[in-house]
Swiss-Prot record:
Zn(2+) binds at Q226, H229, D308, H367. Binds 1 zinc ion per subunit. It catalyses: L-histidinol + 2 NAD(+) + H2O = L-histidine + 2 NADH + 3 H(+). This is Histidinol dehydrogenase. It comes from the Archaea. Catalyzes the sequential NAD-dependent oxidations of L-histidinol to L-histidinaldehyde and then to L-histidine.
Length: 375
């Protein structure tokens, strides 16, 4: 059975059999047979079990992420000309679902998803995450409390995506956000259209460009940091320094030698990596020739792991070369754009003849009559 059929069967089972199917999959995959809803007591217990220093670190990072994202939204775009009003208005999505992997808990991802959602004005947020030994990760619950998320379910995997999309054990959501394994990705792909999705996120990637000025230890550590995410992760080193090319000997790192930094960046544009890191002299002068990357980190104090945690930039990024057409997660992903038009009589009459001609070309008779009646 291929992955499409495997995932499709689970989604269909959950859609048709509801909570009974969720219980079966929770027992089979998570060894869990309890209730799905996380209680206030569980959230309180998680809060009490976290050390003050850990809370301070989480709050500091929370504030940095909030500060970075709060100015992304530039407001409504309304233009008034000749008595006409045209523009774009923005509205938050009514209800979203956040998926946070539970088996290898990454609570930082919840901040990267939840903070821009709150800034966007999303009122209703549901969180699904798989339990480990019957419990949700305590840091995930603490961050959910900071975000004001009270609707939390102990549901993971494909069944969580199906539950959020079809409203099993909860109200259905309008859009699902969050990374997962290949099965979760396939589930998101299959429910798209029933609900929205943020994207399809694969294994982590880093492409590091270094010139002869780069610190060898920084290069090695930064490349290995992304391989730490799992065996399917990718790491590329592109350098115009033969010394660095020869000294960096790491398993599972693909190395390329190019004559110049510009040529190195051109190769990186072809790779279109999730993370592009520049350890070169004067990196800013190369920024304008970078076309394809989920995120760019520059300078000796800008390693990718710092971006993963505390720089404030979002770490939910396009993978698998999808940076050719996709972007980093922002506040706008949690909003809808709605076009607005209120033409004046003068504006309408000055252009309606063109509209009538186009309606005739397309043989749209009622379109023609609708406009003609106003002349």
């Amino acid at each position: 059975m291929d992955i499409y059929e495997y995932v499709s069967n689970i989604i269909s089972d959950v859609r048709i059999n509801g909570i009974d199917a969720l219980k079966r999959y929770s027992e089979a995959f998570d060894n869990y047979s309890g209730g799905f809803t996380v209680t206030d007591d569980e959230i309180e217990d998680a809060d009490k079990s976290i050390k003050p220093g850990e809370k301070d670190a989480i709050k500091n990072i929370y504030e940095r992420i909030y500060e970075y994202h709060k100015n992304q939204f530039e407001g409504q775009k309304i233009n008034i000309k000749n008595g006409s009003i045209y523009g774009i208005i923005y509205r938050p999505i009514d209800r979203i679902g956040l998926y946070v992997p539970g088996k290898r808990a990454l609570p930082s991802t919840l901040m990267m998803l939840g903070i821009p959602a709150r800034i966007a004005g999303v009122k209703s947020i549901v969180l699904c995450t798989a339990p480990e030994n019957g419990n949700v990760n305590k840091y995930t619950l603490y961050i959910a409390r900071l975000l004001g998320i009270r609707e939390i379910y102990k549901i993971g995997g494909v069944q969580a995506i199906a539950a959020m999309a079809y409203g099993i054990s909860m109200k259905p959501v309008d859009k699902i956000f969050g990374p997962g394994n290949k099965y979760v990705n396939e589930a998101k792909r299959q429910v798209f259209g029933i609900t929205g999705i943020d994207g399809l996120y694969g294994p982590s990637e880093i492409c590091l460009i270094a010139d002869d000025s780069a610190n060898i230890n920084y290069i090695k550590n930064d490349l290995l940091s992304q391989l730490e995410h799992g065996e399917a992760s990718s790491a590329y080193l592109i350098t115009n320094s033969l010394r660095i090319y020869n000294e960096v000997k790491l398993e599972n790192v693909k190395k390329y030698y190019k004559e110049t930094v510009e040529e190195s960046i051109e190769l990186a544009n072809e790779i279109a990596p999730e993370h592009l890191e520049l350890l070169v002299n004067d990196p800013l002068k190369y920024l304008n020739i970078i076309r394809n990357a989920g995120a760019v980190y520059m300078g000796e104090y800008g390693p990718v792991p710092a971006g993963d945690y505390f720089l404030g930039v979002n770490h939910v990024l396009p993978t698998g070369s999808s940076a050719r057409f996709s972007s980093v997660l922002t506040v706008y992903d949690f909003m809808k754009r709605i076009s607005v038009a209120m033409p004046s009589k003068y504006d309408f009459l000055s252009a309606v003849d063109s509209g009538l001609k186009l309606a005739s070309i397309e043989n749209m008779k009622m379109h023609y009559k609708s406009m003609e009646a106003r002349i």
